[in-house]
Amino acid sequence: MPRRGPVTPREIPPDPVYNSVLVQKLINKVMLDGKKSIAEKIVYGAMEIIREKTKQDPLVVLEKAVQNVTPLLEVRPRRVGGATYQVPIEVPPRRGLSLALRWIVRAARERKGMPMKERLALEILDALNNTGGAIKKRDEMHRMAEANKAFAHYRW
């Protein structure tokens, strides 16, 4: 904990098109080297692709996809005696949202052979249908937590 007192989370203004903090956070995660206008084009392009493919409001689709990817448990290392145990703990909502967006963007970047807006749109649609790289990452994290359930009493 810092000596200057508790850290207050920064207030993120909603994006101008969808008036959503979630979309603004996604834009910030997509952004590389401070190039926000490029990140905005990618995200808004992906949202248009989602609108065309699903015939639904892309904001609702994005919220559901992020909800599907958000992990409930994660493991944290804890040293006890001479051994380091992987202790499963619940993920706080802010961290869960951050992890979900990070995994969606990473999975989209790992897809190859098409523009980033298409890759992002496909990854969001996959997350909506509980498939894709981001869901695989969440399941892997849940499996690790399940495997280390015996160490849950070391929680702090």
UniProtKB/Swiss-Prot annotation:
Keywords on this record? Ribonucleoprotein, Ribosomal protein, RNA-binding, rRNA-binding, tRNA-binding
Has UniProt tagged this entry with the keyword tRNA-binding?
yes
Highest taxon, organism lineage: Bacteria
> Single Gene Ontology BP term?
translation
What are the recorded GO MF terms, alphabetically?
rRNA binding; structural constituent of ribosome; tRNA binding
Q: Which family does it belong to?
A: Belongs to the universal ribosomal protein uS7 family.
Q: What is this protein called?
A: Small ribosomal subunit protein uS7
The record's listing under PANTHER family reads: RIBOSOMAL PROTEIN S7 (PTHR11205)
Q: How does it assemble?
A: Part of the 30S ribosomal subunit. Contacts proteins S9 and S11.
Q: Name one GO cellular component term.
A: small ribosomal subunit
Q: Which InterPro entries match?
A: Ribosomal_uS7, Ribosomal_uS7_bac/org-type, Ribosomal_uS7_CS, Ribosomal_uS7_dom, Ribosomal_uS7_dom_sf
Write the gene name. rpsG
According to its UniProt entry, the function of this protein is described as: One of the primary rRNA binding proteins, it binds directly to 16S rRNA where it nucleates assembly of the head domain of the 30S subunit. Is located at the subunit interface close to the decoding center, probably blocks exit of the E-site tRNA.
